């Protein structure tokens, strides 16, 4: 697969820490999902079902419990809390544009690097004037992005780069934390 080409090249250049990356893709059948068939179109969904996705892994399981309701076309606009400051639900706008409140014992915020800070900041109250989880004033201040790169090369023989996962691999030898550069982690 495409990782073998990247790995061999990294080894020849002297890199030591080269791996396929940590992905939610089965290498063998597990939890009712097939093993990866190395089709190479992971960004477009997974035909074999090996790649983890809430849409076809967790949501169907939750529906089977009878304790789950999926509200499509809804948008959360605020996380709410009680008088002691403990999160107790969310306010959302439903598909018809009506504002609704949903009580909750636990709220999982999983909106990646844009929507998570937006929601935390929009959840400001008199108790949390700068938004939830923002006592240090850092929510929304430090944008983080997963960088990707594409490399093109002429090879002496066919390498079938269309085989394997979309991300061939990761070389982390140069990913050294050096705070003197003005930031933490990264390249």
Q: Where do the protein language model's features map onto the residues?
A:
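Short C-terminal domain-edge/linker segments immediately following a structured domain
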Residues: 49-50, 121-123, 138-142, 150, ...
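Conserved redox-cofactor binding core of oxidoreductases
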Residues: 1-76
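Glycine-rich loop(s) and the adjacent beta-strand/alpha-helix scaffold that form part
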Residues: 65, 74, 78-84, 90-163
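Residues in well-ordered beta-strands of folded domains
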Residues: 19, 47, 77, 91, ...
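Rossmann-like dinucleotide-binding core of oxidoreductases
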Residues: 149-185
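Short glycine-rich loop/turn motifs that provide flexible caps or phosphate-binding loops at active sites
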Residues: 39, 44, 88, 139, ...
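Broad, structure-driven detector of short, well-ordered beta-strand segments within folded domains
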Residues: 23, 79-80, 130, 182-187
